Amino acid sequence: MIFHKEGSAYNLGIRLADKINEWLYNYEHPIQVHIGSDGDPFASHVYRHFMEQTPERDNIKYSILTNGLMFKEFYNTVPHVINNLQELGVSIDGASKETYEKLRLGGKWEKIIEGLECISELKKKHDFRFILHFVVQKDNYHEMEKIIDLGEQYGADRVWLNKIEDWGTMDDFRTQDIFKTPEYQHTLAKLVQRIHKRDDRFIECPTLISEAVRYKNKN
């Protein structure tokens, strides 16, 4: 992802964004365009340029994955995307100020809450799917139920909880591997009880369940 506004990488990104928009303008069949997954798109000048210039066409639907911190500041600059938004995902790995600001370096709890409030209001108007994504790890597993509460509070359609994975970017991934500890197992059991009580698909945690099953079968 490109965060600056100069240099060859930025210029190449702008040209590519314009080419994609030109292609979208002439494309007549239904299509969904996903924006994000490699960083926050609202923090990228190239992504923002793409979203600002994208054509308004009924056949184009959009999905966005964002960390939510800059959404309120920039959503009104990309009306064509918001008007045709099908799904908005927010990655948030803490359900309290202390945990959130520990895991999201530079992030402010008050700002993400403002973002969630803004998204909640926009959802009422545009009726897009709103999903929270929560990566479970050592410093936040105790907030698995709290993130469910947060999703309910701000009108999310679903909350995804996924086990942290080792992508080779951590110095010692073993320090994050809390998934066999009694404390984590107890917390997961409470979450599973809550899933059964809801009897719907608001809470999704397939990687957590499969990990627990593997651990149980080994023992």
Model-derived regions: residue spans:
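Radical SAM enzyme [4Fe-4S]-AdoMet core and its adjacent flexible, acidic
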Residues: 2-18, 48, 60, 79-219
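Short beta-alpha junction loops
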Residues: 68-70, 165-166
